[in-house]
Amino acid sequence: MNVNLMWFRNDLRLSDNSALHFSCRNNASTVLALFIATPKQWERHCLAPKKKMLIYKNIVALKKKITELGIIFYYYESTDYLESTNYIIEFCKIHKVTSIFFNLEYEFYERQRDKIIKKKLKKNNIIINCFHDSVLITPGSIKNSYGKMYKKFSYFKYKCIKQLQLNIPSCFPKPQNKNLHDHYSLDFTIPIFHTYLEKFDANIFPIGEDIVYEKLKFFIKYAFNKYNFDQEIFELNSTSMLSAHLSIGVISPRQCVTLLFKEYPDIIHKLEECKWINELLWREFYQHLLYFYPNIGQNQSLYHWENRIKWDNNLYYLNLWKQGNTGYPIIDAGMRQLKQLGWISNRLRMITASFLVKNLLIDWRKGEEYFMSQLIDGDFASNNGNWQWIASVGTDSMPYFRIFNPMLQSKKFDINAKFIRKYIPELSNVSTYNIHNPCDNNKTNKIHSKYPQPIINYYHSKKKTLLVFKHAKCSNKL
């Protein structure tokens, strides 16, 4: 009898799961499920404690759901990726596994792990079935006239939209109940991961695919039409708040798109104008880039001129930025929200990142690493791509001379300073003008006795950065 092993990784759901769907397609086969936790490896990758807890909670929910389908769920905690490959081979031998099914991951070390496990599986005559499941469109199917990956998002987006319009995505259904035959039910509690974890707000980041899917339905039905106008505002209800669940595969991008098309059939002809689709396609773009340029995962940018940038890398300033004590209220409110909630809006990510790189002249990699260590929705491809974009060193990045002005951003997106006052209570009684203009108080350069004065002058730092980046770029042409 055939025994199929479903290896869960970054795809913690039953519905629309390519590998799970095909592992269960043959009713005559026995299906086993396995998840391997690698907390030490996660620590090396700076995975946020809140995200590790989100993974744990959703693994517990997944085990319950898949057991109800008659599929036995196994759990193992490994020291690292290499040790996990050894465990899988032993598992396959013990349970007489004939085929293994899993969804691909594009990060550098995950691909190295898969390369190793594929060799071992082939050596043991185990059939390998792997799928591109975390994206809307298979990497490699969107190419330029030279047969290569687009490095400009606008071209990539145009091609993606055309493909989505021609081939509307469909979702795989949840598998039907399996017959356990002579297998017995494994009744055990998944032990807590052996690593530092932090609690998160389950009202904002719910647990389990059914509740998350309901959250998606609510957003599309009641909040989607406001997204084009509210997306840049800092309030939580201005976005879908699904990024954390997309990052660990509790929900798929296909589910997002198919549900949107179902609710608004005519939107398929207006995808270019849809900001939510735009955000999903940025995520897609960075996933495809990582697939084609795996060295991005090794602290490298695609353009070598950035190696000539002379970073200040002031560790004192870096720590003040992390703590939310720069003296720029919008920066500090964003960094404090990141620390407390494990999430900040896309606009705030750009503002705070620009300040670190373009005003404090600190290497973007240090900011990238810190964000990963805090974000409950930390996704390597998107986080890396966004940091390279803001630092003007990645593909299709903004020009190096574009630098976000935190005062103007503050006035535009937090008009009444409601967000700032929420996360910086010491400024609760300070006037909105002074909050938005921390550099304009000529007497003390301080807007409150308990709040720090600006650590740098924005305008002076901007001039310095422009010179440093211009020199690095011009030197590259010599």
From Swiss-Prot:
Q: Where does FAD bind?
A: Y227, T239, S240, M241, L242, S243, D377, G378, D379
A matching Pfam family: DNA_photolyase
Q: Name one GO molecular function term.
A: FAD binding
Write down the required cofactor(s).
FAD; (6R)-5,10-methylene-5,6,7,8-tetrahydrofolate
Task: Outline the extent of the Photolyase/cryptochrome alpha/beta domain.
Answer: 2-136
Residues that, per the record, bind (6R)-5,10-methylene-5,6,7,8-tetrahydrofolate: E110
Q: Where are the transmembrane segments?
A: none
Its domain of life?
A: Bacteria
Q: Where is this site: Electron transfer via tryptophanyl radical?
A: W311, W364, W387
Q: Which residues bind DNA?
A: Q409
Q: What is its EC number?
A: 4.1.99.3
Give the first-level EC class, as a single word: lyase
Q: Copy out the cofactor comment.
A: Binds 1 FAD per subunit. Binds 1 5,10-methenyltetrahydrofolate (MTHF) non-covalently per subunit.
Q: Which Gene3D superfamilies match?
A: 1.25.40.80, DNA Cyclobutane Dipyrimidine Photolyase, subunit A, domain 3, HUPs
InterPro entries to which the protein is assigned, alphabetical: Crypto/Photolyase_FAD-like_sf, Crypto/Photolyase_N_sf, Cryptochr/Photolyase_FAD-bd, Cryptochrome/DNA_photolyase_1, DNA_photolyase_1_CS_C, DNA_photolyase_N, Rossmann-like_a/b/a_fold
Q: Which reaction does it catalyse?
A: cyclobutadipyrimidine (in DNA) = 2 pyrimidine residues (in DNA)
Q: Which keywords label this protein?
A: Chromophore, DNA damage, DNA repair, DNA-binding, FAD, Flavoprotein, Lyase, Nucleotide-binding
* Region named Interaction with DNA: 279-286, 346-347
Q: Which family does it belong to?
A: Belongs to the DNA photolyase class-1 family.
Q: What does the UniProt record say this protein does?
A: Involved in repair of UV radiation-induced DNA damage. Catalyzes the light-dependent monomerization (300-600 nm) of cyclobutyl pyrimidine dimers (in cis-syn configuration), which are formed between adjacent bases on the same DNA strand upon exposure to ultraviolet radiation.
Protein name (database record): Deoxyribodipyrimidine photo-lyase
- What organism, scientifically named, is this protein from? Buchnera aphidicola subsp. Baizongia pistaciae (strain Bp)
